[in-house]
Protein backbone atom coordinates (compact mmCIF):
# COMPACT_ATOMS: atom_id res chain seq x y z
CA UNK A 1 0.00 0.00 0.00
CA UNK A 2 1.43 3.38 -0.97
CA UNK A 3 1.43 6.23 1.53
CA UNK A 4 -0.67 9.21 0.51
CA UNK A 5 0.11 12.43 2.36
CA UNK A 6 -2.90 14.71 2.70
CA UNK A 7 -3.23 18.36 3.67
CA UNK A 8 -4.05 19.11 7.30
CA UNK A 9 -7.77 19.34 8.08
CA UNK A 10 -9.31 20.85 11.22
CA UNK A 11 -11.87 18.04 11.03
CA UNK A 12 -9.19 15.76 12.48
CA UNK A 13 -9.26 17.80 15.71
CA UNK A 14 -13.05 17.48 15.81
CA UNK A 15 -12.82 13.73 15.27
CA UNK A 16 -10.19 13.43 18.02
CA UNK A 17 -12.39 15.39 20.44
CA UNK A 18 -15.39 13.16 19.69
CA UNK A 19 -13.36 9.97 20.10
CA UNK A 20 -11.74 11.23 23.30
CA UNK A 21 -15.22 11.85 24.71
CA UNK A 22 -16.32 8.33 23.74
CA UNK A 23 -13.17 6.76 25.20
CA UNK A 24 -13.51 8.77 28.42
CA UNK A 25 -16.86 7.10 29.01
CA UNK A 26 -15.40 3.62 28.47
CA UNK A 27 -12.13 3.89 30.38
CA UNK A 28 -11.19 4.38 34.04
CA UNK A 29 -10.80 7.95 35.25
CA UNK A 30 -7.11 7.57 36.15
CA UNK A 31 -5.95 7.33 32.54
CA UNK A 32 -4.83 10.19 30.29
CA UNK A 33 -5.98 10.63 26.70
CA UNK A 34 -3.71 12.78 24.52
CA UNK A 35 -3.75 13.78 20.86
CA UNK A 36 -0.33 13.08 19.33
CA UNK A 37 1.04 12.62 15.83
CA UNK A 38 0.92 14.94 12.83
CA UNK A 39 -2.75 15.88 13.20
CA UNK A 40 -2.01 17.12 16.75
CA UNK A 41 0.60 19.56 15.45
CA UNK A 42 -1.51 20.87 12.56
CA UNK A 43 0.51 19.45 9.68
CA UNK A 44 -0.53 17.13 6.89
CA UNK A 45 0.07 13.43 7.00
CA UNK A 46 -1.60 10.11 6.34
CA UNK A 47 -4.92 11.46 7.69
CA UNK A 48 -4.56 9.32 10.80
CA UNK A 49 -5.48 10.51 14.28
CA UNK A 50 -2.97 9.20 16.80
CA UNK A 51 -4.29 8.88 20.33
CA UNK A 52 -2.01 8.26 23.29
CA UNK A 53 -3.60 6.57 26.28
CA UNK A 54 -1.51 6.85 29.41
CA UNK A 55 -2.07 4.26 32.11
CA UNK A 56 -0.76 4.42 35.70
CA UNK A 57 1.17 1.13 35.52
CA UNK A 58 2.38 -1.28 32.87
CA UNK A 59 0.01 -3.98 34.14
CA UNK A 60 -2.96 -1.70 33.30
CA UNK A 61 -2.20 -1.80 29.57
CA UNK A 62 -3.89 -5.19 29.05
CA UNK A 63 -7.18 -4.21 30.71
CA UNK A 64 -7.37 -1.03 28.61
CA UNK A 65 -6.57 -3.04 25.46
CA UNK A 66 -9.37 -5.47 26.33
CA UNK A 67 -11.89 -2.65 26.79
CA UNK A 68 -10.93 -1.12 23.46
CA UNK A 69 -11.02 -4.40 21.52
CA UNK A 70 -14.55 -4.96 22.84
CA UNK A 71 -15.46 -1.50 21.54
CA UNK A 72 -14.34 -1.53 17.93
CA UNK A 73 -10.54 -1.49 18.01
CA UNK A 74 -8.20 -4.11 16.55
CA UNK A 75 -4.85 -5.01 18.05
CA UNK A 76 -1.95 -4.19 15.77
CA UNK A 77 1.36 -5.95 15.37
CA UNK A 78 3.56 -3.03 16.42
CA UNK A 79 3.52 -3.85 20.14
CA UNK A 80 6.40 -3.51 22.57
CA UNK A 81 6.99 -4.27 26.22
CA UNK A 82 5.97 -0.71 27.12
CA UNK A 83 3.42 0.04 24.38
CA UNK A 84 0.35 -1.60 22.87
CA UNK A 85 -0.89 -0.46 19.46
CA UNK A 86 -4.52 -0.64 18.30
CA UNK A 87 -6.46 0.79 15.37
CA UNK A 88 -10.13 1.22 14.60
CA UNK A 89 -9.65 -0.28 11.13
CA UNK A 90 -7.83 -3.43 10.10
CA UNK A 91 -6.14 -1.57 7.24
CA UNK A 92 -5.38 2.12 6.87
CA UNK A 93 -8.02 3.94 4.85
CA UNK A 94 -6.62 7.48 4.99
CA UNK A 95 -10.05 8.68 6.04
CA UNK A 96 -9.34 9.75 9.61
CA UNK A 97 -8.50 6.35 11.08
CA UNK A 98 -7.70 6.21 14.79
CA UNK A 99 -4.41 4.72 15.94
CA UNK A 100 -4.20 4.20 19.70
CA UNK A 101 -0.95 3.80 21.61
CA UNK A 102 -1.32 2.56 25.20
CA UNK A 103 1.71 3.34 27.38
CA UNK A 104 2.49 3.66 31.09
CA UNK A 105 2.54 7.37 31.98
CA UNK A 106 5.88 7.37 33.77
CA UNK A 107 7.80 5.48 31.09
CA UNK A 108 9.95 6.78 28.26
CA UNK A 109 7.61 5.65 25.47
CA UNK A 110 4.80 7.85 26.82
CA UNK A 111 7.11 10.78 27.47
CA UNK A 112 8.56 10.55 23.94
CA UNK A 113 5.12 10.94 22.35
CA UNK A 114 4.45 14.06 24.46
CA UNK A 115 7.94 15.53 24.02
CA UNK A 116 7.82 15.13 20.24
CA UNK A 117 4.30 16.59 19.96
CA UNK A 118 5.13 19.62 22.08
CA UNK A 119 8.45 20.19 20.31
CA UNK A 120 6.79 20.13 16.87
CA UNK A 121 3.99 22.45 18.01
CA UNK A 122 6.59 24.96 19.19
CA UNK A 123 8.86 24.57 16.14
CA UNK A 124 6.78 24.79 12.94
CA UNK A 125 9.84 24.56 10.67
CA UNK A 126 10.80 21.27 12.34
CA UNK A 127 7.19 20.11 12.00
CA UNK A 128 7.37 20.59 8.24
CA UNK A 129 10.70 18.76 8.16
CA UNK A 130 9.11 15.98 10.23
CA UNK A 131 6.29 15.69 7.71
CA UNK A 132 8.82 15.16 4.93
CA UNK A 133 11.04 12.71 6.75
CA UNK A 134 8.70 11.33 9.41
CA UNK A 135 10.26 7.99 10.23
CA UNK A 136 13.96 8.83 10.15
CA UNK A 137 13.59 12.19 11.85
CA UNK A 138 11.38 11.10 14.74
CA UNK A 139 14.19 9.66 16.89
CA UNK A 140 16.47 12.62 16.16
CA UNK A 141 13.81 15.18 17.15
CA UNK A 142 13.05 13.35 20.39
CA UNK A 143 16.72 13.65 21.32
CA UNK A 144 16.81 17.34 20.35
CA UNK A 145 13.61 18.01 22.31
CA UNK A 146 14.95 16.24 25.41
CA UNK A 147 18.10 18.35 25.29
CA UNK A 148 16.19 21.65 24.93
CA UNK A 149 13.68 21.09 27.75
CA UNK A 150 13.59 24.08 30.15
What are these regions (language model features)?
Residues 5-11, 52-53, 116-120:
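Short histidine-centered catalytic/ligand-binding loop motif
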Residues 1, 47-51, 96-98, 116:
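Short amphipathic alpha-helical segments
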Residues 71-107:
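Conserved catalytic core of two-metal-ion nucleotidyltransferases
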Residues 63-71:
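Short amphipathic alpha-helices in soluble, non-transmembrane regions
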Residues 108-150:
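Catalytic cores of NTP-dependent nucleotidyl/adenyl transfer enzymes across multiple folds
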Residues 1-34:
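Helical scaffold of the NTase/Pol beta-like nucleotidyltransferase catalytic core
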Residues 23-60:
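Active-site nucleotide-donor binding segment shared across nucleotidyl transfer reactions
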Amino acid sequence: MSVIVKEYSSKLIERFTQEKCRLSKLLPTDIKIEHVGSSAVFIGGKNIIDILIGVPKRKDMISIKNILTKNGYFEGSDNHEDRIFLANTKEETGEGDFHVHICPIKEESYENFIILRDFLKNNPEKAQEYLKKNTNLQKKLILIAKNTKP
